[in-house]
Amino acid sequence: MSNAPFFTEAWQQMPDEERENYHRAVFMNMEGHYALQKRVEYFRGIMRHVGEGVFIGCGVRIVNPQFVSLGDRVQIHDRCTLMASTERGITLEAGARLKHGVYLDTEGGADGCIQIGRRVYVGTGCCLHGHSGLEIGDDSLLAQNVTITPFSHTFDDPARTIYSQGGRQRKVTIGRDCYLGMNVSVLWSADIGDGAVVGAGSVVVKPIPPLSVAVGVPARVIRKREGLSPAPTTPE
């Protein structure tokens, strides 16, 4: 037996706000050009800024969209999560790409923010935090499952829980034209200079100078890249 008559009657009796929520839930998780248009239209009305030519995939979750800015041609693929917990929020500059399942979280605190530069590629499953700020320079590449955490728990007092002891945090900067391989972890004590390369699976605990190649746990510089400066910025 068809449920169509029951559904039609229920739909007609549904308050306008509930109908709107239903439509939103459908197009947020639908594929196709129409659903994409509706998602972008919806987020453009509630975000700080949405540029032209933006792509927002299925199942994208954005918390506090009023603190999120997307430049022209930004791509946010399926199942990404953006947690803009602070007013400084999250900025994706023109041409930045987040692949499937990327997680961004500014965390708490007034200084929390994430700024991702032009044409930056963030691979599937990356997890990036911005406790005291995270900045990634133009044209950098992050392979799958890279983790960047500008925070470290304090655990000096064994009589107290680790959680209750708080921790240390600072702004972390990834320079322009960097390449971080798969499963790289960048800890709170490390910055990465322009043009540096970090090999897959490395754990970065100290600053990496510009144009260096670093590998290992902990990551150590094994050589310098040829050339005197990072590649020039790619034209728009």
Q: Which residues fall in each region the model found?
A:
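Basic, gly/Ser/Thr/Pro-rich low-complexity segments located predominantly at protein N termini
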Residues: 186, 204-206, 221
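Flexible, glycine/small-residue-enriched loop-and-beta-strand segment within the central core
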Residues: 61-70, 75-190, 217, 225-233
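C-terminal/domain-terminus segments
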Residues: 191-215
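Short Pro/Gly-enriched beta-strand edge/turn motifs at strand-loop
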Residues: 54-55, 77
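Long amphipathic N-terminal alpha/beta scaffold segment
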Residues: 43, 49, 55-67
